[in-house]
Amino acid sequence: MARTPVSEVMTRSVVYLPGETTLDEAAQVMRDRQIGDVVVTHGPTMAGLVTDRDIVVRAIAEGLPPQSTTIESIASREMIMVEQSATVEEAVQAMRERGVRRLLVCDADRKLVGIVSLSDLAMLPTSLVNSADQRQ
């Protein structure tokens, strides 16, 4: 199981929102779709990633008004990707090294096909997670 590819545990339904979307609109989309992140777009390109935690920590806690603050203004610009063939162990290692809770998952052509999060990994059997930890 330690060789499980991230494609087997990732979330496949990626939600894209334009950068001018407000925080309250993005939060409503996340709530309605039961997701914790959205990919921010600027025209046809990906401009960043915003998580539910970003909205709370980078915006609300800082006093930014959610009705007028855009997701582009708080988006993480550095989007860390792994290929869908990467193992869960490799994804865990990448998250640890980069201090992130989510990785974008791409195919061999670098097309986004999903997102793998700590929540996705938490759903794995304990034996798989322990196996990845022991190799660190």
Predicted regions span which residues?
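Short beta->alpha transition motifs characteristic of CBS
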Residues: 35, 39, 46-61, 100, ...
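Helix-adjacent hinge/juxtasegments
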Residues: 46, 51, 64-73, 78-85
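Nucleotide phosphate-binding site architecture
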Residues: 7, 15, 24, 56-57, ...
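Bateman (tandem CBS) regulatory domains
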Residues: 2-14, 68-79
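Short, charged, intrinsically disordered terminal tails
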Residues: 126-136
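The conserved cystathionine-beta-synthase
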Residues: 16-34, 41, 82-99, 106-107, ...
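Short beta-to-alpha loop/turn elements within the nucleotide-binding domains of ABC transporters
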Residues: 4, 21, 50, 69, ...
